[in-house]
Amino acid sequence: MKYTCLILLWSLFATMALPADNLIQSISIVPCPESITPGTGYFTFSGKTDFTVENEEQAEVARCFSALFTQAAGFTPCVKVGEKKGKISFLTDDALKSEAYHLEITPRQIIVKASDTKGFFYALQTIRQLLPASIEGTAVVETADWSVPAMTIKDEPRFGYRGLMVDVARFFIPKENLLRIIDCMGMLKINTLHLHLVDDNGWRIEIKRYPLLTEIGSRRVDRPGKSFPERRNPRQGEPTVEKGFYTQEDIREIVAYATRHQVEVIPEIEMPAHSNAALASYPLLACPVVDKFIGVLPGLGGNHADVIFCAGNDSVFTFLQGVIDEVVELFPSRYIHLGGDEARKTHWKECPLCQERMRQEGLEDEEALQGYFMARMSKYVQSKGKEAMGWDELTNTRIPDGAIIYGWRGYGQAAVKAAEQGHRFVMTPARIMYLIRYQGPQWFEPLTYFGNNTLKDVYRYEPIQKEWSPEVRSLLMGVQASMWTEFCNKPEDVEYQLFPRLAALAEVAWTQPWHKNWRSFLVAMDKFNEHLSAKGIVFACSMYNIQHTVTPVNGKLQVKLECERPDVEIRYTMDGKEPTDRSLLYKSPLMVTGTQTIKCTTYRAGRQMGKTLTLPLVWNKATAKPVLGNTQAGKILVNGIRGSLRQSDFEWHSWESSDSVAFTIDLQKKESLRSVSVGCITNYGMAAHKPADIEVWVSNDNRDYRKVSGKQFTDGEIFREGTFKEDVVLDLNKEIGRYVRIIAKGAGECPATHVRPGQEARIYFDEVMIE
């Protein structure tokens, strides 16, 4: 069936060449091309379609594309080298930049021009997205119309580095699933796969010289039912289970497949930290002062993550050089990533070998010792004809000569610091490009940690900042999304976190900012999601869900409902019934008094698109009353909404244990007070715990206060394991007062037996309820 919604648009624009951002809904390509000139009619693929190409490299690109038709259409367009007059012709144009392409589609033929195989490949990926989504299937679709609209496209990338980092160490991604991700990367013109192969939680690559790395390092203890931060460290002798690794033959297959899809695979071998899997396999490579059992960590590890490679032991460098020797033979990439992040120097400070190394090398502190470590390994990588890369902690001391820095902390500012010293850099800021973060309203999302990086957050990211000098701008290689996998338990979990945000990253990396358009992107992304669905790829629909904000305003509650999608309606009810497409249409914030339950969801063309959000607004004497001296707390603690089990869901107010926790609620008149309830959350793995003690003070005039109730808790009551909510209820015995002051004291540092020993616990309150 022809795309009827396109036909009118093609006829309207048939004689006009317009920038891509003006052709809203006329095509469906992610990332958005540089320019498009619509034509008239359609080119139809059939068993008579043939490719004529100039050489074998082009032929390989054409065959990769033709294979899609073999499975989905039952015919295979033939590929001919050196012949003329094919339906689809490849022509080399040396005037085009690398990866750029010109694509001319008419009803009779398709002409593809590029200067390299990458450009030819990307031109065909553009055609692939224009085809029906059933092109991705494995069964022949007899009724499909394999037509694409006539047009001329001129396209080239904004950045040369368009990357995705996938962490296969914390959760091992089977080879077959990784290949599916690579295929999707090719469709999106993402050209770099940064493969995080090793960490505290697993060693995932076979090194023949050191077989224990996979015999021991790929295994770990199971902690069923526990999220990553909650998992306790392994005990010596505790049984382990195989979590997986790639053989060297697997790696060769992955690299070859990626090469066919124009994806460069960069291996990362972490050092000196994130090395428990390696040190569990070869414990003599740790500092001799380490007196604890070294095992592959199932979770964060607490102070066991302090165990890192010994910088004073030459055997460590011999070992790592041996690993690098095999890695360079497996990966043809120009680059090897050496990690370098989050190295705690606890044992280095106590280690006689490390201290002796510092004296020998004239190093002033342990940070400089890491600089020595990374510089030494960087030079070895360079001796193998490769370039070294590392995380932005390399800027904490002298950066290794020639090292490429990945900016990840915060908004990646440290990488700019490296650029000011002449180093190339890649931006992958955690606050925007870490796909482990929630991609939509958290009440609907699988548990992870930290805050939100929504589809729109990723899409609107602009890596080049106005204040950057021309020199800094010239050193930016590109951008990368980073997929950390500690909360993933199956390959589908990884896919869910990746898609569709990876499509947004693709447009950031490929498309010039002036061609980007949020509404146009959503239309194209919807079509791309159809391709994902046909491939059996799991993707999130979080952008259809509703984010709520409930704020006290003049004694009422203002309920604001928002959706990232501008093309949907929000329908809601206030009578407890499920919303339909005929329910009340949300147009502006709702003002609520008294207990209410609001239910709402999104609709488009009569079809429900998002999940139903239920907001039970619970009213009590504190609801919508002023909270004195703490504006932010006043927006949360008396807004009638209880928090979820995700303490970052914007319904929890938090304090460090060392903070002074004190706030006052003005009831605006004297009241008889029976009780105060304070909602708390325990998230053991994130060191979120209720306070050590809590007190209630009451006043009639906001000057003279009297203590009317209080509770204290033992360490056993505070530092309970699990993730759960509870209300701390304090009896006020019908005390009379207008002002109610809550004072709480934190529990301080988590005890030595905690999964986060020594870390300061945080207090989280969601609601104060006064009866």
Task: For every predicted segment, state its role.
Residues 1-25:
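Bacterial Sec-dependent N-terminal signal peptides
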Residues 19-20, 40, 52-53, 512, ...:
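Short, compositionally stereotyped local motifs that mark structural "simplifiers"
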Residues 20-159, 493, 508-523, 527-531, ...:
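Contiguous, structured surface segment used for ligand recognition
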Residues 96-335, 376, 380, 480-484:
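Feature activates predominantly on carbohydrate-active enzymes
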Residues 116, 602-606, 746-748:
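Surface-exposed loop/turn motifs at beta-strand-loop junctions within extracellular Ig-like
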Residues 283, 299-300, 304-402, 409-417:
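Active-site neighborhood of glycoside hydrolase catalytic domains
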Residues 388-393, 398-403, 410-558:
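Flexible, acidic glycine-rich loops studded with aromatic residues
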Residues 646-709, 724-771:
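Aromatic, loop-rich ligand-recognition surfaces of beta-strand-rich domains
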